[in-house]
Amino acid sequence: MEPGLAFYQEKMDMKASKSIIQKITASNGGVFTGPGTNSYLIGTEDITLVDPGPKIDAHLSNLLKLGNNKIKRILVTHTHPDHSPGAKVLGDKLNVPLMGRLVAKDDSRQDRTFKPDQILSHGDTIKTSEYTIEVIHTPGHASNHLCYLVPEEETMLT
């Protein structure tokens, strides 16, 4: 592991015991995903799910179990097939809004099943009684890529 990544992981591990952000890794390890796509649950009562990942039944079931019927919204960082296909499945099952940006029409590498109920823009804010999520548009990796800053946790989900 690169020194910078090791430091980042160590910092995340130190915060994990008191953090309201829980990381869950899908079993889709590979060249582009490393050990697998990371999904995140933010909060303890009013939970936000970020990047539900691919449609892998065991992963989606695990997210539902850990979300404990408290997931109120699903956000995606971008619509590559390893990040967003689980959104529709879980959104339908939980009856919660899907949030993110539209798929670029000219990009065939995108997950076309993702249709946000709410389109997020740079500068948008999601507030709950536990935390705030600040939306940052970061095109590059994907034209519809968003990052989510959780100031209370000093954490940016990319």
Stretches found by the model and what they are:
Residues M1-K11:
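N-terminal amphipathic/basic-hydrophobic helices that include classical n-h-c signal peptides
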Residues A6, G30-P35, P54-E134, E153-E154:
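Active-site HxH/HxHxD metal-binding segment of metal-dependent hydrolases
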Residues Q9-D13, I42, G123:
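A detector of low-complexity, intrinsically disordered, Ser/Thr/Gly/Pro/Ala-rich segments
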Residues K15-L66, C147-T158:
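Conserved beta-strand hairpin/beta-sheet module of binuclear metal-dependent hydrolase folds
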Residues V135, L146:
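Short beta-strand His + acidic residue motifs that chelate non-heme Fe in jelly-roll/DSBH
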